[in-house]
């Protein structure tokens, strides 16, 4: 029997990415306290949260594969979250200007039959152009990236902020490492092709 697929996320970006592989899935809101633990590294944080999200859906029935994902952005060795305000978005982009920032994306696939989770972390680097405050403000006013870690949307005008991108899968930057997910699903017996 083929496993049913659940995305433990309410993110429209993750739903859109997952729909690219043309498998039927349902999206469920995970129950997860996303507060970092004291002295927790970015990698440990995102893998812990991805696995917690995948395990938090309360599905006891066998034959489900539940996908959990979490992402943080690190600027100058400091974890930054979603800015939520214009002022904070401008501040984050000023800190990123001319620097490399790193996104860590945790991905977990929980198998409800075996009660086992396969969890990884994928890294993606973004090299920012040297930006003026005016360029940053123009970008923030046009795209309003208040609910995006790092204060940009790479799938939109945010691409103009970058000098180069470095990573295995560009989907990782948006929040769901699709190439790795396909490998993980196939390992669980769910073939995409």
Swiss-Prot record:
EC number(s) in its UniProt entry? 3.6.1.-
Keyword Lipid biosynthesis carried by entry: no
* Site feature (Important for substrate specificity) residues: 13, 71, 155
Q: Which UniProt keywords apply?
A: Cytoplasm, Hydrolase, Nucleotide metabolism
- Please tell me whether the keyword Oxidoreductase is annotated for this protein: no
Q: Which reaction(s) does the protein catalyse, per the Swiss-Prot or TrEMBL entry?
A: N(7)-methyl-GTP + H2O = N(7)-methyl-GMP + diphosphate + H(+)
Q: Name one GO biological process term.
A: nucleotide metabolic process
PANTHER family named among the record's database cross-references: 7-METHYL-GTP PYROPHOSPHATASE, BIFUNCTIONAL DTTP/UTP PYROPHOSPHATASE/METHYLTRANSFERASE PROTEIN-RELATED
Protein's recorded name: 7-methyl-GTP pyrophosphatase
Q: Which organism is it from?
A: Aliivibrio fischeri (strain ATCC 700601 / ES114) (Vibrio fischeri)
């Amino acid at each position: 029997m083929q496993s049913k697929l659940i995305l433990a996320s309410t993110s429209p970006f993750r739903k859109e990415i997952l729909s690219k592989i043309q498998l039927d899935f349902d999206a469920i809101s995970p129950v997860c306290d996303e507060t970092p633990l004291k002295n927790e590294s970015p990698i440990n944080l995102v893998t812990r949260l991805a696995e917690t999200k995948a395990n938090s859906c309360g599905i006891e029935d066998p034959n489900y594969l539940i996908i959990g994902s979490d992402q943080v952005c690190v600027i100058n060795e400091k974890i930054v979250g979603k800015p939520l305000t214009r002022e904070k978005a401008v501040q984050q982009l000023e800190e990123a200007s001319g620097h490399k920032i790193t996104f860590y994306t945790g991905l977990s696939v929980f198998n409800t039959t075996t009660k086992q989770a396969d969890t990884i972390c994928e890294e993606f680097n973004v090299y920012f152009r040297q930006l003026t405050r005016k360029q940053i403000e123009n970008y923030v006013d046009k795209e309003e990236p208040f609910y995006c870690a790092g204060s940009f949307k790479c799938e939109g005008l945010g691409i103009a902020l970058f000098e180069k991108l470095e990573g295995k899968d560009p989907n990782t930057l948006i929040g769901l490492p699709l190439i790795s997910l396909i490998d993980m699903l196939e390992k669980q017996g769910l073939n995409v092709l």
